[in-house]
Amino acid sequence: MKGLRKYLSPFAPDQSGAAAVLCEFHGLIIILDAGGCAGNICGFDEPRWFESRSAIFSAGLRDMDAILGRDDRLVEKIGKACEKLSADFIAVIGTPVPAVIGTDYRALSRMIEKKTGIPALTIDTDGTKLYDDGEKKTWKELFKKFAVEKDVEPGRIGIIGATPLEFGGIYEEDFLKKYFAEKSFSKVVCYGMGDGLDAVREAAAAEKNIVVSPAGIAAAKYLQQKFGTPYELFCPPEIIPEWKEKKEQVAGLLNVEELSEKKILIVHQQVLANTLREEFISANINVASWFMMNKEQKKEQDILFKEEDDWITYIKENEYDIIIADPLLKKAVPFYKGEWYDLLHFAISGKKRQSV
């Protein structure tokens, strides 16, 4: 049955992805809902909510506000909030409610800017898609709104696509900046995870952009078209703290001749999964994901899952010797008898790596 889940919990939706991108940019983030969606974002999908301050609020829509489309009341609420809070911009994130009533996001953005004098952007998420779709829209809108012409700084790179939903279960926040700084880049900017809105404004100064998740590709393409900034899809395998040990464990099970005969499945977001595949060049490895997959990076045998039943059937019909995936997915395939190596994906399980 389509949409039926007996083993897997619901994955993070698009509005959570939008909020994850904007969380560290010192903006006033309004979830356009009655309260439930904002509660899910802060309570389940945004781990930084418990560790740092971020102005994420519910619009608190009432029945008649939604039915009559009282955008003026929302704008009035936002204006009052801005009198008490300092924000560099205002973001309104959509949910199923505005999708159903047909909210005019462009008009809403203009009304907010006129009322407050603060830059506003709106993200037309609708709660029916997954987190990566919301991230994709938000990254692109953010750079379209704020990035301006700048002279290129040699040795400066920008990292696009990092959020806790992509990596929150497996790495420390400053890992990517440290990793690329050690690769002789003079300045490393990680948008949304360590670097704020000023970095977005200066995005054109980057000599190159590194895209670490599929959700960042649309923004990287925009920056390439607008400012000529080249980009590369890459996510270092060392982002997984135990990767060296896990790689040695897998290699220890198999010698070089056996490796080419064994089937391995890696399940995560596509950029990271592809990077891990390259670590075992001689092996028969397929990449799978529940989230967007870039056609240019997708190999013939790679697979995109949509339903829980798709996952169960696929594992039954394909005898993999090793699976590298979030442990939550293992619950749906108790019959699997091969080797399983945990690779956390926060958007799937909501689980973070336990500090040792």
Regions found by a protein language model. Give the residues of each.
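An N-terminal assembly and electron-transfer interface module characteristic of large anaerobic redox
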Residues: 1-356
